Amino acid sequence: KIKRVKKIDNKNKDFYKSYFFNKKNKLPLVDAKIAISKDFLTIKKKSKWITNTRSRNVGHLIRSKYDCIISTSTSINSDNSLLNCRIKGLNNLKPDLVIIDRKLKLKKKLSLFALAKKRKTFLFTTSNNSKKITFFRKKNIKVIKLNSLSTRKNFLFFLKELFRLGKRRILIEAGLTFLNVLSKMRLINNVYMFKSDVKLGSSGFNNSKKNFIKSLKNFKQINVNLNTDKLFKARVR
């Protein structure tokens, strides 16, 4: 006789939430991760790090819970970011990487190309530039052409394509501009927000309005030791 489980423990709660979301909507569950200063700035002028080492290590653990990370060519070009798991015991070829690059502006000399030989990397574009498409394909990047990526309908088609490729849990790591777009389209479920205890003032800025940050609600602080930093999980309105 099979015993019916009445309660799901906290360890598996997120998994089951995404499972039921996938089953109901035939779409991947989309969450986001963002780092901000005490005065709610997301970019530091002379460094790409806003939060401390402990926060970044926990960020790698969060990444490991997702099938893929979505970022934009703008964010990757700015930080030369790998967007993988880089702490001992985790697979540094995971999660898979999805790059949104409408006009194929991704730089040709980036660290992620070295990992693309073994790591699944997808690039979604609306460009017809065959020369650049050939270049990226030679770098072992799977280029997928979209007719358009500007409306909610377009983005739902994009997410359904990722679902078809087997992606069930997706983490967004990008700038405020892109997050504002997805928030307005109501395509993000939860947000992990790492908050520094340091005000950046004139040494920091935002590249877009803080609409995304203002859209967050039901903040819950996660009990993890990040020294002076704090980690919150919130839902998007």
Model-derived regions: residue spans:
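Enzymes that bind and transform nitrogen-containing heteroaromatic metabolites
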Residues: 3, 7-237
